[in-house]
Design a protein with these regions (language model features):
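Alpha-helical membrane segments and adjacent membrane-interface helices in multi-pass membrane proteins
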Residues: 33-71
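Alpha-helical transmembrane segments and their membrane-interface boundaries
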Residues: 1-48, 130-133, 137, 144-155, ...
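Cytoplasmic-side transmembrane-helix entry/capping segments in multi-pass membrane proteins
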Residues: 53-62, 83-86, 105-114
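Structural signature of hydrophobic alpha-helical transmembrane segments
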Residues: 20-36, 73-90
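Pore- and pathway-forming membrane helices of multi-pass small-molecule/ion transporters and channels
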Residues: 12, 16, 29-47, 92-94, ...
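Membrane-interface helix termini and inter-helical loops of multi-pass transporters
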Residues: 74-79, 124-132
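Membrane-interface starts of transmembrane alpha-helices
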Residues: 6, 29-32, 80-88, 105-109, ...
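Transmembrane alpha-helical segments of multi-pass membrane transport proteins and ion-pumping complexes
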Residues: 11-24, 60, 64-72, 89-101, ...
Length: 161
């Protein structure tokens, strides 16, 4: 079986499991399936394997923390009026890129994905403050990246002759 067909089967089946988990047992923790899917994609974007797993979790969590901080400084920047949020996001974006000077934070796209996932959860408007959004976001990132790793492993088993 080709790798692409094996990944099709593996990812398709595991997406069913992940969605069930997030809409069922994990829903009480405010974890989000869409955040997990972003982390799952980031895992493959980072080349998969253990290295892709580590890069995804470390950089997405870093991005999420920076994103949380960016949202939190919008209030103190309120004197800027309509520019408060754009300036806060710009500061956060600069921090993400500066962080890439550290080799373990060099996967800038994954850091951006992390920033976007926490900001997205905050913007859903379900009484989700920045500090309330960070833990479910980090948990969703970890679980999503783990699903990426498992899907790769399962596909590997299906392609062995």
């Amino acid at each position: 079986m080709s790798v692409l067909i094996a990944l099709t089967i593996s990812i398709g089946l595991l997406a069913v499991v992940a969605t069930w988990l997030f809409l069922g047992p994990l829903a009480a923790f405010h974890m989000q399936i869409w955040q997990a899917f972003v982390a799952w994609a980031s895992f493959f974007h980072n080349g998969g394997k253990t290295d892709g797993l580590v890069k995804t979790v470390v950089c997405m969590v870093f991005g999420a923390v920076v994103g949380m901080g960016s949202v939190m400084i919008i209030g103190p920047l309120g004197g800027l009026g309509a520019l408060a949020a754009p300036v806060a996001v710009g500061i956060g974006a600069a921090v993400l890129v500066l962080g890439a000077h550290l080799p373990f934070l060099a996967a800038i796209p994954s850091s951006v994905y992390g920033f976007a996932t926490v900001a997205g959860l905050i913007l859903l408007g379900k009484d989700m403050t920045p500090t309330a959004a960070i833990v479910p976001t980090i948990l969703s990132i970890i679980v999503g990246a783990a699903f990426g790793w498992v899907s790769e492993q399962l596909a590997g088993v299906m392609t062995k002759k």
